[in-house]
Amino acid sequence: EILQKANSYNFTSDLAEKHSLDEEYSVWNLVELLPVGKFVELYTMYYQEYKSSNYSDYLQSNKFLRNAAAHSNCLMSSIMKPKGAKKFRKTIKLTNALSQAQKEISLHARSKYMAYPTFHDFVALLFVYNDLLKEAANRNMRDKTMDELYHFFCEKDGRVLKYKEYFEKNQVIAEAYRFISGVIQYIKKQNNNPKHKRYLKI
């Protein structure tokens, strides 16, 4: 794959050409050149070989949303009619982690929305992000991002609620909003809890 990149024009072709001539190069050189899907494969392979705590169970979900965003896919068009739903299998560990949000999200809502890939993968993305950035050195950046997301979704002058009258009568969108809003409120509460350690079991 590095040779292929080196022989074709793209934004990493110069870097690929440089490393294609190296007899040995470091794994982080490889990471610089790999597309997201190949990075996930490399990450999973590494932790299959070297057993330790990792996020392999959740990275496919993160990859799905990253690719959808990168290609400007319209996720709204398929939130209740998930593409590839027959192949979709929700992550039990993720569902169990969300079960801690009993005050914010009802059991019915958790069961319903975690069965849809888009919602399932968005929850996975939020939990992985907040777990990875929980250390003191990254916490300010994490909290800033989550404050922006909370404002966007949950506050009256945020983008989502600013024109809520457009969607109030659409039960599909309104119920989906309440689920996502509940997830974000739960994360904000837990991030402010000094006893909270992590969202996911890894």
Regions found by a protein language model. Give the residues of each.
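Homeobox/homeodomain signature
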Residues: 21, 65-66
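Polyanionic, low-complexity intrinsically disordered segments
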Residues: 40-64, 74-202
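Short, contiguous, well-structured surface segments enriched in hydrophobic/aromatic residues
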Residues: 1-54, 76-77, 131-139
